[in-house]
């Protein structure tokens, strides 16, 4: 199936060292920053019993196999909070999930999270919440993703005392 964004963020969190403040002072370690480029929709398999999906998801969830169902929902920001609570910043580039008004799957599974618009709906709101202050940008189809990502990188670099590989 699609993308398990929250699972990916949890995996990143598990392999990141304890961050420093990036001051380049003796004993300090680099500040950690995670860049997330996404359309903001988790599309993952969850257990039929005991799994949870957003309360606004369209139920019943589609059956994937005998033990799982397919959950499509905006990012659950729990993993973001865990990462940020460790002192790791998160930069988010939202490649907007644009409306597909003639597509039945979109209308029945995604549209309720993308209202009133892709820039202001639940998907965008959760990604803004995931991002560290000042480190959120969005781009629509036809927009310049490279420029948006470069601008985010410049924001991160200009607010970090030193960069290390």
Predicted feature residues:
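P/S/T/G-enriched low-complexity
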Residues: 1-165
């Amino acid at each position: 199936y699609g993308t398990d964004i929250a699972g990916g963020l949890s995996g990143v969190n598990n392999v990141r060292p304890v961050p420093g403040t990036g001051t380049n002072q003796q004993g300090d370690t680099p500040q950690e920053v995670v860049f997330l480029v996404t359309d903001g929709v988790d599309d993952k398999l969850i257990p039929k019993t005991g799994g949870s999906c957003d309360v606004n998801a369209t139920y019943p969830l589609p059956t994937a196999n005998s033990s799982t169902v397919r959950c499509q929902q905006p990012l659950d920001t729990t993993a973001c909070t865990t990462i940020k609570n460790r002192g790791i910043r998160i930069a988010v580039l939202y490649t907007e999930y644009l409306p597909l008004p003639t597509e039945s799957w979109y209308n029945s599974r995604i549209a309720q999270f993308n209202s009133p618009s892709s820039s202001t709906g639940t998907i965008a709101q959760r990604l803004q919440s995931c991002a560290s202050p000042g480190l959120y940008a969005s781009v629509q189809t036809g927009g310049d993703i490279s420029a948006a990502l470069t601008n985010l990188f410049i924001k991160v670099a200009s607010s970090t005392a030193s960069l290390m590989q």
